[in-house]
Design a protein with these regions (language model features):
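Small-residue-rich helix-loop
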Residues: 316-401
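Single conserved hydrophobic/aromatic residue that forms the stacking wall/gate
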Residues: 424-435
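A conserved active-site cap/scaffold subdomain adjacent to cofactor or substrate pockets
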Residues: 243, 247-324
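N-terminal Rossmann-like or analogous alpha/beta NTP/dinucleotide-binding catalytic cores
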Residues: 1-112, 206-220
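Active-site cores that bind ATP or allylic diphosphates and position pyrophosphate for catalysis
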Residues: 94, 98-227, 233-239, 247
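Structural motif
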Residues: 251-259, 294-296, 300, 329-335, ...
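Hydrophobic, well-ordered secondary-structure elements that form the walls
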Residues: 412
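Short, conserved secondary-structure transition motifs
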Residues: 74-78, 230-235
Length: 435
C-alpha cells in the first residue's frame, strides 16, 4: 500500500487539506503502508518555496512523516514522454478556440437548455489545417479525448460512484503556453510512484472520472479512491482556504496540541466518538476510514478547544515538563502541573497561572484580612470538586464571617486568582474549575 499527499505551495496549509494529509498518513499507519509527499508546483507564478517550507513544517508539527518527497516542477521530462504516447494514441488533440469563443459556445448551449459540454469541433480539423494555424502563430491547447462509456468505481467512503462520459467535456490537459493543468502530472506521478490508494476531498470526484480514463490510456492499473466530505462551519457554510485563522500554523501558535488536531480531524463526521486521547497508537487502532460519514462534517472551534483542554488533563508532569520548559515557565514542579492542568485549555497558559500564584503567595499585596484567608482555607471542602462545591464553600464562609455579595466574592476571587476581575472577562479557558 502506498499513499500520497499532494499540496500546492500557493498558501499555508489549512484545516481542509490538512485533514486530507492526516487521513492519508493515518491510513498508511493503520495498514503498514508507505506515505509520500508530492509538491504540486507546476504553477510557477503562484508557487513559492516559502509556502513549501511552511507546509512541510506544519506537517512535521502535526507528527506526519514521509518516506520521501518530490516536486512536480522537476519532472517535466517524464510528463513529456507520456504526452507523446497520448498524442500517438490520438487521445490528446489540439484545440484553437479562444476563451471568448468557448464562453459563447457555453452560453449558447445553456440558453438552449443543453449541458455545456465541449462539442469536439477541433477534431474535424485536418492535419494541414492544424499545421497552418500553428504556423500562423496560434498555439493550441490540448484536450484529452474521453471514451464515451460509463466510468465507475467503488469509492472507499462514498460507495458506488459513476459518470456517463458522454455528459463530460473532454478536459484540457495542456494550456496554450505549454504549461500543464492538474490532471496529467497528477496521474503520471501516481503511475510512476506506484500509488495504490488516493484519498482526497470530494471536490475531486469529477476529476477522478477523468483520471481513471487517463490511467487506462496509459495502460496502468487504477488505484483505489476515497473521497472525504468537506468540513463546514456550524451554520453549514463552507470555509475559505484563505481564512488565515484556520491555518495549521495559527492553531500551533495558539497552543493546540498536535494530537488534539489529529484526533479531531480523523473522527469528526464519523461514527466514532471524539474522546480525548494522548497516545497516537490508540488513535491508529481506533481509526476506520469506512466509519467516515458521506455528508459534510461541522467544524466547531469550541469543540476542538474543549478536546484540547481535556487532552491536556491526560498528560503527566513527565510527559509535559519539556513543554513547560519551552514556554520558559519558572515553575518546573509536578505540584504546579497538577494544580493548573484542570484549569487551562493550552499549556502556554501556565504563564498566566505563574502570575496568579506569585500574587497569591505574596498575600500582603492582596490587602485581605488574615482571618478571612484562614476561614476560607479551613472551610475548603476536600477533593473532588463538582458544581455544588462553590455554593457549599461560600455558604460556610458566609456563616462564619457574615460576609455576603461583593464583600464575600471579591476577596475570594483575589485569593483564588490574584485578579480583581473575573477570569471570565480575562481569559475564559483559564477560569479555575472551582469557580
Amino acid at each position: 500500500m502506498k499513499c500520497r499527499f499532494a499540496p500546492s505551495p500557493t498558501g499555508k496549509i489549512h484545516i481542509g487539506n490538512a485533514r486530507s494529509a492526516i487521513l492519508n498518513w493515518i491510513f498508511c499507519q493503520k495498514n503498514q503502508g508507505e506515505f509520500v509527499l508530492r509538491i504540486d508546483d507546476t504553477d510557477a507564478n503562484r508557487s513559492s518555496k516559502e509556502f513549501e517550507t511552511s507546509i512541510k513544517d506544519d506537517l512535521k508539527w502535526l507528527g506526519l512523516n514521509w518516506s520521501y518527497t518530490f516536486n512536480q516542477s522537476s519532472r517535466q521530462h517524464i510528463y513529456n514522454e507520456k504526452i507523446q504516447i497520448l498524442k500517438q494514441k490520438k487521445r490528446l488533440y489540439p484545440c484553437f478556440e479562444t476563451e471568448e469563443e468557448l464562453a459563447l459556445k457555453k452560453k449558447s448551449l445553456l440558453s438552449s437548455g443543453k449541458p455545456p459540454i465541449y462539442d469536439r469541433s477541433s477534431l474535424n480539423l485536418s492535419d494541414e489545417e492544424v499545421e497552418k494555424k500553428i504556423e500562423s502563430g496560434i498555439q493550441p491547447h490540448w484536450r484529452f479525448k474521453l471514451d464515451h462509456e460509463n466510468i465507475g468505481w467503488k469509492d472507499i467512503i462514498k460507495g458506488d460512484v459513476s459518470f456517463d462520459a458522454k455528459n463530460l467535456s473532454d478536459p484540457v490537459l495542456i494550456r496554450a503556453d505549454g504549461t500543464l493543468l492538474y490532471h496529467l502530472p497528477s496521474v503520471i506521478d501516481d503511475i510512476e510512484e506506484k500509488i495504490t490508494h488516493i484519498i482526497r476531498g470530494e471536490d475531486h470526484i469529477a476529476n477522478t472520472a477523468y483520471h481513471i480514463q487517463i490511467f487506462k490510456a496509459l495502460e496502468s492499473s487504477i488505484p483505489s479512491f476515497a473521497h472525504h466530505p468537506f468540513l463546514v462551519d456550524e451554520t453549514g457554510k463552507g470555509f475559505s482556504k484563505r481564512l488565515g485563522s484556520l491555518s495549521i500554523e495559527n492553531f500551533r501558535d495558539e497552543g493546540y496540541e498536535n494530537i488534539s488536531l489529529l484526533n479531531y480531524f480523523l473522527f469528526i463526521g464519523s461514527s466514532s466518538n471524539i474522546d480525548p486521547i494522548k497516545d497516537l497508537n490508540e488513535i491508529v487502532k481506533k481509526f476506520d476510514i469506512q466509519s467516515l460519514s458521506r455528508s459534510s462534517a461541522k467544524f466547531s472551534i469550541e469543540s476542538l478547544r474543549n478536546l484540547n483542554e481535556n487532552t491536556i488533563k491526560l498528560f503527566s508532569y513527565n510527559e509535559i515538563s519539556h513543554k513547560l520548559k519551552n514556554i520558559k515557565s519558572n515553575f518546573q514542579k509536578e505540584s504546579f502541573w497538577r494544580f493548573i492542568k484542570n484549569n487551562i485549555s493550552f499549556v502556554n497558559q501556565a504563564k498566566e497561572w505563574e502570575e496568579v500564584i506569585t500574587k497569591i503567595n505574596n498575600a500582603k499585596d492582596l490587602n485581605i484580612d488574615d482571618s478571612f484567608i484562614n476561614t476560607a482555607v479551613d472551610e475548603l471542602p476536600e477533593d473532588p470538586f463538582d458544581e455544588t462545591t462553590w455554593d457549599h464553600w461560600t455558604s460556610k464562609i458566609n456563616k462564619k464571617t457574615g460576609l455576603k455579595g461583593k464583600d464575600l466574592f471579591m476577596p475570594l476571587r483575589l485569593i483564588l486568582t490574584g485578579k480583581s476581575l473575573s477570569l471570565i472577562h480575562i481569559s475564559e479557558p483559564t477560569r479555575p474549575a472551582l469557580i
